């Protein structure tokens, strides 16, 4: 439902530009906005507004948890409430800024995916620090700076997800139905979620501020074993 509504929002509120700026930390809303953007046939831009400016990019839409994290030059801007269950922005919105939760409710729960070429760019990680993809719930391996590509086409992202799943046994039938995804990096988190989904498993995403007690509770409640 959320992905369809976001895809409708993206399509209605913006025209294709350099991408949709998802200026959000690891969070279920980050997953929803990235996947909704892909459903709409658009590219996702990760990183801060500073990263966007430094790269000389002009996103068609900028989404963030705080006003100062938005890209002011974007065609449209939306603030998303950080509270997981919130259905609207908690306060007064800045002028011309949309509510990235309440304003989604106007859009249908169904959206026909936009056909997009496999070689089209789907993800630009402007804040990449050279962390290699890791299996769901594990720590990313350290690789030389710059070894992780900052730009991925749809075909490349699919290949990376398939490779990660095959190398880590993500589809192991004896594993629990849920996977704990705990990464401080949004791009890494997205890939771990996609690996879990491809294996038919549920991804339990922890936000960066979640401590070990929260992680232990999630593992216990979801019955996560591997």
List each model region and its residues.
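A broadly used, surface-exposed interaction patch
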Residues: 16, 30-33, 40-46
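Conserved short alpha-helical elements in the N-terminal third of ANL/AMP-binding
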Residues: 36-40, 189-202
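Hydrophobic, Leu/Ile/Phe/Ala-enriched alpha-helical segments that form helix-helix packing faces
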Residues: 6-14, 33-37, 56, 66, ...
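ANL superfamily AMP-binding
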Residues: 2-22, 51-54, 154-180, 225
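Conserved pre-ATP/AMP-binding loop-to-beta segment of ANL
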Residues: 84-180, 184-186
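Glycine- and other small-residue-rich loops at beta-strand/loop junctions that grip anionic moieties
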Residues: 22-23, 181-182, 204-208
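Conserved coil-to-alpha-helix start sites within the AMP-binding
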Residues: 24-34, 182-194, 213
């Amino acid at each position: 439902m959320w992905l369809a509504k976001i895809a409708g929002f993206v399509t209605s509120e913006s025209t294709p530009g350099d991408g949709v700026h998802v200026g959000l930390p690891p969070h279920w809303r980050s997953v929803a906005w990235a996947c909704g953007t892909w459903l709409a046939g658009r590219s996702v831009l990760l990183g801060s507004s500073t990263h966007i400016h430094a790269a000389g990019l002009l996103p068609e839409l900028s989404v963030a948890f705080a006003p100062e994290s938005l890209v002011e030059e974007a065609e449209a801007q939306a603030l998303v409430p950080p509270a997981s269950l919130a259905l609207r922005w908690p306060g007064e919105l800045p002028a011309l800024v949309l509510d990235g939760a309440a304003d989604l409710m106007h859009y249908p729960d169904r959206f026909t995916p936009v056909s997009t070429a496999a070689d089209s760019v789907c993800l630009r990680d402007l804040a990449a620090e050279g962390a290699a993809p890791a299996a769901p719930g594990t720590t990313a391996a350290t690789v030389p700076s710059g070894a992780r590509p900052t730009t991925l086409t749809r075909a490349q992202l699919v290949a990376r997800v398939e490779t990660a799943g095959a190398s880590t046994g993500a589809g192991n039938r004896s594993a629990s139905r849920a996977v704990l995804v705990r990464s401080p990096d949004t791009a890494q988190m997205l890939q771990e979620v996609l690996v879990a989904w491809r294996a038919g498993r549920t991804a339990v995403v922890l936000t960066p501020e979640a401590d070990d007690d929260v992680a232990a509770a999630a593992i216990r409640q979801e019955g996560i074993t591997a």
